[in-house]
Amino acid sequence: MSSLVTPQHAEELSTGARQLGVELTAEQHEKLLGYLALLIKWNKAYNLTAVRDPDEMVSRHLLDSLSVMSFIHNDRDNWLDVGSGGGMPGIPLAILHPHKRVTVLDANGKKTRFLTQVKMELKLDNLTVIHSRVEAFQPAQPFDGIISRAFSSMENFTNWTRHLGDTGTQWLAMKGLHPADELVALPADFTVESEQALTVPGCQGQRHLLILRRKA
């Protein structure tokens, strides 16, 4: 274990994952802690996250990402994390689902360099890192799932990514407060399939997940 990661961090991750109903293998637990160590190390120079205290990163980043894993269904193999930043939730998604293809996209070169380092050090062969604005990204095929965490408004999220999916794609938007005002501006061809209030161990404040589909 890296000197940047403490036994308390390891225990908080194990306990929090169990509370979320996520059973981590020893390898997944080790890789998540390895990711945490890289995040702590690189954040000092690269400003990857506004969370500066390593003791807050387990709950506010790792467990927050794990809180949506029960909504990542087995029949969806090709996922995109838009505006991934420091890699949440894309890196935990790739660690927990090694047989799914996960693409993490960000327009910030420093952040994609960090994500490339994570891919290399943790040997995440199922992870693809893309340095691009989301509007300019042109994948070879639609994604099965598109997820974002604190990326933009619901209107922008759907408009900027509509070309990356089709009517079979699920869009997952991770939010803090329920974005009722943002849903008013949701494009007419998108519909809300499900709204979930989430409880994240160690996190204060509200968490919500909205699952959307495109009608046409």
Curated annotation (Swiss-Prot):
EC number: 2.1.1.170
Cellular component per GO, a single term: cytosol
Keyword Cytoplasm belongs to the record: yes
Binding annotation for S-adenosyl-L-methionine: 83, 88, 134-135, 149
Catalysed reactions listed for this entry: guanosine(527) in 16S rRNA + S-adenosyl-L-methionine = N(7)-methylguanosine(527) in 16S rRNA + S-adenosyl-L-homocysteine
Superkingdom classification of source: Bacteria
Gene3D superfamilies to which the protein is assigned, alphabetical: Vaccinia Virus protein VP39
InterPro entries named in the record: rRNA_ssu_MeTfrase_G, SAM-dependent_MTases_sf
MF-aspect GO terms: rRNA (guanine-N7-)-methyltransferase activity
Keywords: Cytoplasm, Methyltransferase, rRNA processing, S-adenosyl-L-methionine, Transferase
Pfam families, per database record: GidB (PF02527)
Primary site of residence: cytoplasm
Subcellular location: Cytoplasm
Family: Belongs to the methyltransferase superfamily. RNA methyltransferase RsmG family.
Record function comment: Specifically methylates the N7 position of guanine in position 527 of 16S rRNA.
Protein name in the entry: Ribosomal RNA small subunit methyltransferase G
Source taxonomy: Bacteria, Pseudomonadati, Pseudomonadota, Gammaproteobacteria, Pseudomonadales
